[in-house]
Amino acid sequence: MNIDLNADLGEGCASDSELLTLVSSANIASGFHAGDAQTMLTCVREALKNGVAIGAHPSFPDRDNFGRTAMVLPPETVYAQTLYQIGALGAIVQAQGGVMRHVKPHGMLYNQAAKDPRLAQAIAKAVHDYDPSLILVGLAGSELIRAGERCRLVTRQEVFADRGYQADGSLVPRMQPGALIHDEEQALAQTLDMVQAGRVKSVTGVWTTVTAQTVCIHGDGEYALAFARRLRAAFNARNIHVIA
């Protein structure tokens, strides 16, 4: 059994270089919520050195609140902003002799696109128009995945090791109780349930089905590095291969 393990990087965390030895895919902040030209270049070089698949991590323009502010923008604006960020990282990747492999929206852009078909379509179209061979990463079972499929993109359905789920398969909003899982044992058990059994237990106790093609470890999490090591060990013990 194979699984992709991804992390959001280039967001100012000291553990980036170590995480790049443990994950198979890196979502690199592309300037709108965190990161700049230099951090993108540094992350790209480190990812290439470790053989890690590189992806753009576009966001709403919200550096003050780390891309976590809800915004209502015209789809054409979201299309342009997404295309701009993909292109910025893509230029750096190309200049370093690499190939960009995927795009995963960040924060509130990701969450809103999971439920808003018009927003999801704008993102998927930007990805397709930049490079139709790119993989679009989105919340499992979400509108973003459906938009990617409509645009004939390869999609990858994502699950989260350290986030609480609602009964409909969506993430618990960050400001609500149960949004974040701080207990490593709970996060590990949830991840293995999603990967091996295709199910997740919601904060209300209801089990729901989920398709896990890639698992996210938040690079800005306090225990991200230690948890990544534990998760890799758990995968190895169960003959689950981490591969992009």
From Swiss-Prot:
It comes from the Bacteria. It is an enzyme of class 3 (hydrolase). It catalyses: 5-oxo-L-proline + ATP + 2 H2O = L-glutamate + ADP + phosphate + H(+). GO terms for biological process: carbohydrate metabolic process. Its EC number is 3.5.2.9. InterPro entries: Glyco_hydro/deAcase_b/a-brl (IPR011330), LamB/YcsF/PxpA-like (IPR005501). Gene3D superfamilies: Glycoside hydrolase/deacetylase. It holds the Pfam family LamB_YcsF. One of its GO terms (molecular function) is ATP binding. SUPFAM superfamilies: Glycoside hydrolase/deacetylase. Keywords: ATP-binding, Hydrolase, Nucleotide-binding. NCBIfam families: PRK05406.1-1, PRK05406.1-3, PRK05406.1-4, PRK05406.1-5. Forms a complex composed of PxpA, PxpB and PxpC. Belongs to the LamB/PxpA family. Catalyzes the cleavage of 5-oxoproline to form L-glutamate coupled to the hydrolysis of ATP to ADP and inorganic phosphate. This is 5-oxoprolinase subunit A. It comes from Salmonella paratyphi A (strain AKU_12601). The lineage of its organism: Bacteria, Pseudomonadati, Pseudomonadota, Gammaproteobacteria, Enterobacterales. The gene is pxpA.
